[in-house]
Amino acid sequence: MEECIKRKHIQDSFNAQIKLVNNRIPNGHIREHCIANLGQINMIGRDRCQQVRIERPTANGTALALYTVVDVHDQEPDIVFLDKNEDDLRKRLELEHSNVADFTGKVNAQVTAVGLTDAETEYSNEFIENLADNGHNRGLIVIAPHGGNIEKYTDEQAEHVGQKLSSEYVSQWICKGFKKGGGAFDRWHITSTDISEDSFPKLKTVMRRHFEYSVAFHGWRHESICIGGTIPDDVKDQIRTAIVDVVSDPRIEVNTDYEHKCPEDFNGNSKVNIVNRLSANGLQIEQCEKTRKYHGIDIADAVADVIGRLIKM
């Protein structure tokens, strides 16, 4: 993040030659990563570490997905490199296995749609960010970076915590993404350690607030729940106890990251994870879809009860 530099931009997008390559994108979440020319992305107001939309024309309209610019190159300005993984390209940009080849597309600086209601966002297959904040709260911020149909029900959980606790002490930052027929995750997901506030204008307004606590609701495919983040372990234990009490399925394990039972990529401990950048006491909760669907609000209640007691009121 510290490598990112603010520069004035003079346009919002550029036509690009998308080159598909092997073994060039740095390790990590390469399906969401791209490499671009620094001067060219600066022209659209973006920089290294920030997000862009990459669009590809199709017979039925436009295929698009969000990408993070993880590195830059000094070749022709309009060249953008993506990893040549056929499954990822099919899911993200609708490239069929028989037609995985370089293409001409567009790189757009706009990440979130502006001025849409939640219903309009769903109807338009779009992606928005919502912020509920009184301008001075420093107690708690609850977030769902992957709401809508990206990681279903997580936005409802974050909204419920905000409704249950006093708005004077709780802020909410929630993103919602949709795609008819499925595929919202492939189109709109940006991993939490990559999220740049420079690509999310509403998030940027609260990034330097230094909240006392932050909570992030997430979904994953593992049939369990992981409680992680930088919040003290004794608070994680309280959260686990509260969640176990409301999740009635004994087959769903509720683990904490310090027990080393959570996959490293999902333990929420990274300092650049957005939940930990918002507060030194960041709490990340990863949940399988079954618990989100049938116990999501109960889990949100449990989290609100524990964190609510800790906020300085």
Model-found features: residue ranges?
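Basic-flanked hydrophobic alpha-helices used for secretion and membrane insertion
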Residues: 65-73
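Short beta-strand-centered segments at strand-helix junctions
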Residues: 11, 19-52, 72-103
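N-terminal catalytic or cofactor-binding beta/alpha core of small enzyme domains
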Residues: 2-8, 12, 94, 106-313
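Terminal interaction modules at protein C-ends
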Residues: 59-61
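A generic structural signal for residues embedded in beta-strands
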Residues: 53-57
